């Protein structure tokens, strides 16, 4: 798998016999630490600092004797002083404790198991092992009837009952909800100790990114139990609309003019700075931000600061000309009607004409020098034991849907290249189980806002695959022909459910962590709490779901859930007591356990056994 490489991050790994706090450090950690990229011999730690500088991590197996250390330097202001360090040389399946030097910011983690420790030539030659993970979506911390409250009670439950029992987590979209998006570059410059002449290039070209950075800091500061969770549990993430902007559609639709659509790359850049670093990515080329010279009626884009011949555009997304207003990233329906830059739209790059010149489609509408960006591809894959996980990007390449024509054969949720990557990866997989992680739902439509105030006025709402039926049905038919089970893990809708699509294909939606629940009769196509359901050409079986009746006031729809997934591959059968001798099940099992987020009580469990009719 390919991991995001932070080339500007300087690592200084320095194991010491007796690591200890030195003199007070001038660099203060303001956010984090957070854990990611778990492996059997390493773990990555993320922090943000008040200024660029060195951070030292003390760690060890004994909580009271952190005898090793690893130092690194955070990145510059263009990344909001964020950075990561990967601690290598760790023992597999082992609990480590750590603390940031000269801080009270501490945590712990367990490395992933290693196949070599479970191999048994006669009973488990491949070294399969068991593991668990938690997944859900929707961390909305807002009050006023938008959530379970700013205290984020689910994370109290997770910290007390779950974190020591799992190997990792997947936050399947909407980790972030929009706050502070109107934070100004001037406020940010003061915060980071820079004058206007020192403004980083990214802030010059995309000034509204500072509001997204502040949005992340706002949630990390107010969500102390959330921050505690991330200090102990390595997490993978998908980016959904709220990481970018609520109800963002059509970012892959050439010619589409929409304020929200063209905020994609700004939100995505901030997501990589704060969360996306933790993910494996198939393409590691970052987005390009620039200032374009456009001429009315011309299909030429010029940028004297660019060298397009050095950009591998086949590994990048399409081009957006930004809206250009200070409130471009604020989720407010009234702002959608306010004009942006006259050339703001979604563009296709037709040809590179030279280092500084592109041919684009459509043609420019006006003379101007607007800000623009060429987007980043955000999907990737990782493997744990006999399970492959495909993390999809359901927002970057999405064409404009049509609720009245959901079978449009040209409509796409993930784009042709990502679709091919997904099918090729699954076709070539040697694993027993396939997990496809989609931030949006597969069989149930998302056609209502749950009574929220902010709505996308330009198009009828449906975030789900139910308005991309050709692509969805192509995937279901492909998956159903495999000799392995496929589990589509979804989020977005603020309800949990377990759905059997075919004998081989299942959808499991988990959440919300803290957001208010949707009312299925209004927001989810009138689906039942369980039983047969058909929305579009295919019927499915809803085995169980969380549910909110339509007569419950919005502020009272607080039924948060989370799901713990347990993969049972092996059992221990030692000759002597307390020994280890692992045998692989002929038919491994995956158990999905849905829990009440307030109490941790088990609400539903579904077990799939591989290879049994």
Residue spans of the language-model regions?
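Bacterial N-terminal signal peptides
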Residues: 6-14
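Long, structured stretches of catalytic cores involved in phosphate-ester chemistry, encompassing
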Residues: 21-85, 89-613
